[in-house]
Amino acid sequence: MFLLTGYEYFLGFLLIAAAVPVLALVTNLIVAPKGRAGERRLTYESGMEPIGGAWIQFNIRYYMFALVFVIFDVETVFLYPWAVAFNRLGLLAFIEALIFIAILVIALAYAWRKGALEWS
């Protein structure tokens, strides 16, 4: 006797979802033109000949600011549903949110103290 009755559609969907990307990659390997590695590595600037190199180094500070932004952006994503359902959640959820915000404030203070937010 099969114990997973009712899951046939899910299994079929899962197999199709796994097969479509594999089929797309295999089709690309078969159909794509080969031997144009030199052209492929050139910088494209609207059909014009590129001026200068495209491989430049960015200052690591950009990554630090981006990382701090992502952290607080994720905080917003987590706090928005909490704020919408604030009246129904009660005191325990409020305390959990305060702990979450406190952890992020401590992380911000740590980053600030280490100089991650200063451009020097």
Swiss-Prot record:
Q: Which residues cross the membrane?
A: 10-30, 64-84, 89-109
Which Enzyme Commission numbers does its entry carry? 7.1.1.-
Major localization listed first in the record, in broad terms: membrane
**Annotated membrane topology:** Multi-pass membrane protein
- The answer on whether this UniProt entry bears the keyword ATP-binding reads no
Q: Where in the cell is it found?
A: Cellular thylakoid membrane
User: Does the keyword field hold Hydrolase?
Assistant: no
Q: How does it assemble?
A: NDH-1 can be composed of about 15 different subunits; different subcomplexes with different compositions have been identified which probably have different functions.
Q: Which family, according to UniProt?
A: Belongs to the complex I subunit 3 family.
Query: Which protein is depicted?
Result: NAD(P)H-quinone oxidoreductase subunit 3
Gene for this protein?
Answer: ndhC
